[in-house]
A protein has these predicted regions:
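Compositionally biased, intrinsically disordered low-complexity regions used as flexible
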Residues: 1-2, 178, 274, 865-873, ...
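Conserved P-loop NTPase motor core
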Residues: 1-612, 616-634, 684, 705
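Generic detector of short, well-ordered, non-transmembrane alpha-helical segments enriched
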Residues: 3, 392, 493-494, 678, ...
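Extended, charged helical/alpha-beta scaffold domains that provide interaction surfaces
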Residues: 33, 321-329, 335-343, 572, ...
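Short, Lys/Glu-rich amphipathic helical modules
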Residues: 444-457, 692, 718-720, 746-751, ...
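Hydrophobic, well-ordered secondary-structure elements that form the walls
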Residues: 449, 497, 798, 834, ...
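Short Cys/His-rich zinc-binding micro-motifs
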Residues: 879-898, 902
Length: 924
């Protein structure tokens, strides 16, 4: 216990003390609901909803709701939630994170909290890390919900809109973070409200909350459309990159390293970047026949070369990605899973495809995007569960306003966590790992070995094969057998090698898993995997094949359950599951997750981390202290090193990396917050249109603003008619409002006309043309056209704006050299660009509404018939809205406004120059 805890007491303990009375109330209600018949218990949902309508908050019915669900779970599943699980459910209901160790029954905890919150009728989303868990948990817990007359849905990849809409309309919806996020983006691209699938974001329970809200927070959700064809530049740049000589450094010193003469590009291991040296730049200029690679005209070429050297120098096959069936697939660095459907952005994925010699895919165009941080902040109430969250508590508080409550285990954890064993070399480390595996294997103790990459897991597998030890390998190449492999990792004598065990979601039970053994036998009997899984599930079905398989499954399960119980006792006697870590992860949390696979529900277990001074974490982040220690240690590679200083270096290195990664995630969020403000405005406006809000008055307002903006562009100085560019104004509005004979004023007539007269003339004419259009088309049809046109224009402009903002972000970092905050600059310029986009939406909407052709018998109105040229209307003159300083001058000179008619506005030359440069760098 730290000094802070000694003085002030542990935060979790204080909060648990407040929750204790609610838990006790739930336990007191046990006998009340146990005495009810099934029908009476199932009818409690309607009664509780009725009470909720009368009472002010859900808290008033919470104890009854949890007690009802607890009794239902016992009757349906044979599992009665423990008191600690009730506490976990209360924590989730309160919108917090419940830290619960592996094997403590988080699925049942989510079931309790989801049921209680479903009583509001607003919907509950239970978020899992993959489709398998979403389907399995929804089926298992679905039986409880069906018993309680509560509807349940599951959202899976590949479902159509009707299936998804039905799932979202259920009281409780299970699904993955990807599907929930992508469906939100897709919903904000529809033209008709009936095409939306989601409803409001009321309450979410996020399973493996640290994996979803922390680890994946650096990767935004992006819906892409097909962009331009992939250019030959990727292949040419790759061929060139392969001729260059790389130099690897732990951390780059810009000046010293760029002057290196013996390397063409530098690989910075700590920052994971690749940078051309002077030598590399010269070779590029010669190879591609350009004078200056850094010239603005060569930016595309420079970008392709930079991505090619990163693909070849930084990105490692079987660590960062795998190649499967001619396709480059990203490997999640935290879980070791393949990230299906994800691609590296900014052309890096194409560069890797060129490197690996597979087909280079088309470049993509971003249609919609959001970060996980901003998606999950949409929920009115957010909660989560994980085995390890305390190390990231500060981030949960700062970003999501969530606190972390440690839930005590149902039984004490008796796992023995041994001190780290450190070796001088990697070879010595793996020799020791093999010896430890052999020692455990001899006595039948199951072993789970965690590795940090596919490459290391396969190397270890070869060593075990050489020793004749039968084992299973779980990594990104074998992810399709993931659940089966993990489920049997606790068998007597089992040896399992797994890449990054984070978020695996399947409990490792000592003695093996009766369910998975039964499933395997069903498939051997000829049942398909789909039928076997459904047979083991809880869904209601009339399918005869599934019912027959379910009968077989029950027999097999009963048989294997007895076997597993006997074997589990043998495994306990052998010491339980032994966890071996072969390298420290960048995050302490991932290490803790690996350890947490052992010692569930009071079972025995052990864990040891075997490390070497050659491990990436030690080598890259350990710094000079590790190097000095290596020089002074006079030990061979097979002798373990134990040192308090070494342990301290490891922990401080991990804290350093965690801090750096937090800053990266925070930086991503800072930029996305700018986009998020704009996204909320656009999506809110879209929703109002979808909800059927009458747009007609808004459209009339747009017409007036469009006219006024147009006049302001061409009549900048209202007092000097000689400067009026009436010809330019006429041409701008030709085909919409103006006709050829307009503005043919004599000098005398011109002297009597004000700028406001022009505005009034054009506004009046435009409104009359539009009124005639409404008369011809009919009010109902025109209003529907208005709705569709506005949505289409908004979507088109918003997509282009996303690209523009992305381009702005790429170059904005350079502003820091001018002592400017890049995020502040991004926000300011981003808002200017947003204002420009809104004006552009207005203009394009008006133009389309005036020119769109609708096949009707009646002809569209002619502008000449609506208003005769020369008619004026006198109104109060308003101050002209001037064009932007970087806009082309309306006088027609071809110069920028600030360097022409706007030059006399008191702007200093150096300020103008500075703004010119800013504009250019943002375009880059």
């Amino acid at each position: 216990m730290g000094l802070f805890d000694k003085i002030f007491g542990n935060y979790s303990k204080k909060e648990l003390a407040k929750i204790e009375p609610i838990k006790n109330k739930v336990l007191e209600l046990e006998s009340k609901y146990a005495d009810m018949s099934d029908e009476e218990l199932g009818g409690q949902t309607a009664i509780l909803r009725g009470k909720l309508d009368e009472l002010s908050t859900l808290d008033d019915v919470l104890p009854d709701a949890l007690a009802v669900c607890r009794e239902a779970a016992f009757r349906v599943l044979g599992k009665k939630p423990y008191p600690v699980q009730i506490i976990g459910a209360i924590v989730l209901h309160q919108g917090r994170i419940a830290e619960m160790k592996t094997g403590e029954g988080k699925t049942l905890v989510a079931c309790l909290a989801a049921y209680a919150n479903s009583l509001t009728g607003k919907g509950v989303h239970v978020v899992t890390v993959n489709d398998y868990l979403a389907k399995f948990q929804s089926e298992e817990m679905g039986k409880v919900f069906h018993f309680l007359n509560t509807s349940i849905g599951v959202v899976l990849t590949g479902m159509n809109k009707e299936q998804k809409r039905e799932a979202y309309n259920a009281d409780i919806t299970y699904g993955t973070n990807n599907e929930f996020g992508f469906d939100y983006l897709r919903d904000n691209m529809v033209i008709y409200k009936k095409d939306k699938v989601q409803r409001e974001h009321a309450f979410a329970i996020v399973d493996e909350v640290d994996s979803i809200l922390i680890d994946e927070a650096r990767t935004p959700l992006i819906i892409s459309g097909q962009g331009d064809k992939s250019t030959k530049l990727y292949s040419l740049a790759d061929r060139f990159a392969k001729t260059l000589k790389p130099v690897t450094v732990v951390e780059m010193d810009d000046k010293a390293d760029n002057d290196l003469l013996d390397g063409d590009y530098i690989i910075d291991e700590k920052a994971k970047t690749a940078t051309l040296t002077k030598s590399g730049v010269k070779k590029a200029e010669k190879a591609f026949n350009v004078i200056n690679l850094m010239d603005a005209d060569n930016m595309t070429l420079a970008h392709h070369i930079n991505q090619a050297i990163k693909a070849n120098g930084v990105m490692k096959k079987d660590i960062d990605y795998v190649v499967k069936d001619g396709e480059v697939l990203i490997v999640d660095e935290f879980t070791g899973r393949i990230m299906q459907g994800r691609r590296f952005n900014d052309g890096l994925h194409q560069a890797i495809e060129a490197k690996e010699g597979v087909e280079i895919a088309r470049e993509s165009k971003t249609i919609a995007t959001i970060t996980y941080q901003n998606y999950f902040r949409l929920y009115g109430k957010l909660s989560g569960m994980t085995g390890t969250a305390l190390t990231e508590e500060d981030e949960f508080r700062e970003i999501y306003k969530l606190d972390v409550i440690e839930i005590p285990t149902n039984k004490p954890v008796i796992r023995v966590d041994h001190p780290d064993v450190v070796f001088k070399t990697e070879k010595g480390k793996f020799n020791a790992v093999i010896e430890q595996v052999i020692e455990c294997h001899k006595k039948g103790q199951p072993v789970l070995v965690g590795t940090v990459s596919v490459e290391k897991s396969e190397y270890l597998s070869r060593l075990l094969k050489n020793k004749g030890i039968k084992h299973e390998v779980l990594n990104a190449k074998h992810h399709d057998r993931e659940a089966m492999i993990v489920a049997q990792a606790g068998k007597y004598g089992a040896v399992t090698i797994a890449t990054n065990m984070a978020g695996r979601g399947t409990d490792i039970m000592l003695g093996g898993n009766a369910e998975y053994k039964s499933l395997a036998d069903l498939q051997k009997m000829g049942y398909s995997e789909e039928v076997a899984v459904e047979a083991a599930g809880f869904s209601n079905t009339q399918d005869e094949e599934v019912l027959a398989a379910r009968a077989e499954y029950k027999k097999l399960y009963a048989k294997y359950s007895d076997e597993v119980k006997e074997l589990a006792e043998k495994v306990r006697e052998a010491g339980g599951l032994y966890i071996i870590g072969t390298e420290r992860h960048e995050s302490r949390r991932i290490d803790n997750q690996l350890r947490g696979r052992s010692g569930r529900q009071g079972d025995p277990g052990e864990s040891t981390f075997f490390l070497s001074l050659e491990d990436d974490l030690m080598r890259i982040f350990g710094g000079e202290r590790i190097t000095a220690m290596m020089d002074t240690l006079k030990v061979d590679e097979n002798t373990p090193i134990q040192s308090k200083m070494l342990t301290g270096v490891i922990e401080s290195s991990q804290k350093k990396i965690e801090g750096r990664n937090f800053n990266i995630r925070k930086n991503v969020l800072n930029y996305d917050d700018v986009m998020n403000t704009q996204r909320e405005i656009i999506y809110k406006q879209r929703q109002q249109v979808l909800d059927g809000e009458d747009l007609h008055e808004n459209i009339l307002g747009m017409i007036k603003e469009f006219v006024e903006d147009s006049v302001n562009m061409y009549i900048t100085d209202e007092d000097v008619q000689d400067n009026w560019n009436l010809q330019g104004l006429k041409e701008r509005l030709m085909g919409i409002i103006t006709v050829e004979d307009d503005f043919n004023y004599t000098p005398q007539e011109l002297d009597e006309i004000t700028k406001q007269d022009i505005i009034d003339l054009l506004e009046d004419r435009a409104l009359k043309i539009y009124a005639k259009r409404e008369e011809d088309l009919g009010q109902e049809l025109l209003h529907e056209i208005e709705r569709v046109v506005l949505l289409k224009v908004v979507d088109t402009k918003w997509m282009a704006h996303i690209d523009d903002m992305d381009e702005l972000k790429k170059g904005i970092g350079l502003r820091s050299y001018g002592q400017k905050n890049p995020v502040v600059e991004y926000r300011m310029e981003g808002m200017d660009m947003f204002d420009d986009m809104v004006a552009s939406i207005r203009e394009d909407t008006v133009r389309m509404l005036f020119t769109i052709q609708v096949r009707k018998n009646s002809a569209a109105p002619k502008r000449e018939d609506v208003l005769k040229p020369g008619e004026h209307h006198n109104m109060t003159v308003r101050k002209a809205k001037k064009p932007g300083r970087n806009d082309l001058c309306p006088c027609g000179s071809g110069k920028k406004y600030k360097n022409c008619c706007g030059a006399g506005n008191g702007v200093q030359a150096d300020e103008a120059e500075q703004e010119e440069n800013s504009s250019d760098s943002s375009e880059e």
